[in-house]
Amino acid sequence: MGNAPAKKDTEQEESVNEFLAKARGDFLYRWGNPAQNTASSDQFERLRTLGMGSFGRVMLVRHQETGGHYAMKILNKQKVVKMKQVEHILNEKRILQAIDFPFLVKLQFSFKDNSYLYLVMEYVPGGEMFSRLQRVGRFSEPHACFYAAQVVLAVQYLHSLDLIHRDLKPENLLIDQQGYLQVTDFGFAKRVKGRTWTLCGTPEYLAPEIILSKGYNKAVDWWALGVLIYEMAVGFPPFYADQPIQIYEKIVSGRVRFPSKLSSDLKHLLRSLLQVDLTKRFGNLRNGVGDIKNHKWFATTSWIAIYEKKVEAPFIPKYTGPGDASNFDDYEEEELRISINEKCAKEFSEF
């Protein structure tokens, strides 16, 4: 009987590997055959803005025919071109239409018109983790652990497909009706087999190797996980300053201060993730994600139960019914002006 847990772990590991192998096949098919123009703008009633970005906004919309509610990301083609983000947007759409995992937001439709690109995703009504964190200050360790486990599984899935997210942060984690997470915003995500060099992401969350303009790999997402867990448990990120350059200096120095209230297990995990030396960073070693999933801080986590959403969430967002957007901030609304001539046709031909 002594080795029963080890046998169970091995069986679980094998079933995870089987799942990931099948998921890879499904992903590669959709990656190689991307869906185009699966709806049109007149099929949706635009209700209100849920969020704003540099070249567009996300709106709550209702499908006229089915009555279903969705989150529609509307991107201004000319602004995307001006800000040299064409490749990022094409990547985002191609990745979103090919992935399928419980903790990743799902793309339902995509289309374009003369002026805009549209990504229509499932609507996640609980709002951003960022807003929740601001409201409560910080999460207890069990609460942070519940969320962190879902991000670990999502990143494990993405990495098995050679995808790097590159922008994991509380603003990009939405809370669903059950209190589980949905990772959103794949604007910086990229399919990379080896290394890549692009400087992108959010200052507080950038790994040192990105700042130092070294080629970097998937390990940047595990660094970002460390920043995320720290921010959830402490209430602010580990590397913080007024100017990005000061933040970068702190990140590259690798010095992290831990409040005494954190458990020793959590401090150990964070030191292993916020590790400047890539040959020592958890997630990037011989055991891969195993070093993270088998860490003492996750000792009480049942990974299968989390994946199947069988664990009771520590927080359930208020939700009065379809179309309730009270968990999102208010924004000024403005009319979409659609040109009579097609803009940037060449740049977005494959969208």
UniProtKB/Swiss-Prot annotation:
Q: Is Transferase one of the keywords UniProt gives this record? A: yes
GO terms for CC?
Answer: cAMP-dependent protein kinase complex; ciliary base; cytosol; nucleoplasm; nucleus
MF (Gene Ontology):
ATP binding; cAMP-dependent protein kinase activity; protein kinase A regulatory subunit binding; protein serine kinase activity; protein serine/threonine kinase activity
The record's Gene Ontology biological-process terms are: high-density lipoprotein particle assembly; male gonad development; renal water homeostasis; signal transduction; spermatogenesis; vascular endothelial cell response to laminar fluid shear stress
Which residues, renumbered to this chain, carry the PTM Phosphoserine?
Answer: S339
Q: Where is the lipid attached (N-myristoyl glycine)?
A: G2
The EC number on file is: 2.7.11.11
**Activity modulation comment:** Activated by cAMP.
**Which of this chain's residues are annotated to bind ATP?**
L50, G51, M52, G53, S54, F55, G56, R57, V58, K73
Positions annotated as active site in the UniProt record:
D167
All residue ranges annotated as the AGC-kinase C-terminal domain in the record: 299-351
Q: Which UniProt keywords apply?
A: ATP-binding, cAMP, Disease variant, Kinase, Lipoprotein, Myristate, Nucleotide-binding, Phosphoprotein, Serine/threonine-protein kinase, Transferase
What does the annotation say about its assembly with partners? Answer: A number of inactive tetrameric holoenzymes are produced by the combination of homo- or heterodimers of the different regulatory subunits associated with two catalytic subunits. cAMP causes the dissociation of the inactive holoenzyme into a dimer of regulatory subunits bound to four cAMP and two free monomeric catalytic subunits.
Which disease appears in this protein's record? Bleeding disorder, platelet-type, 19: A disorder characterized by increased bleeding tendency due to platelet dysfunction. Clinical features include epistaxis, hematomas, bleeding after tooth extraction, and menorrhagia.
Biological function: Phosphorylates a large number of substrates in the cytoplasm and the nucleus.
Query: Which family does the record claim for this protein?
Result: Belongs to the protein kinase superfamily. AGC Ser/Thr protein kinase family. cAMP subfamily.
The protein here is known as cAMP-dependent protein kinase catalytic subunit gamma
UniProt organism field: Homo sapiens (Human)
Question: In the record, what lineage is assigned to the organism producing the protein?
Answer: Eukaryota, Metazoa, Chordata, Craniata, Vertebrata
Q: Which gene encodes it?
A: PRKACG
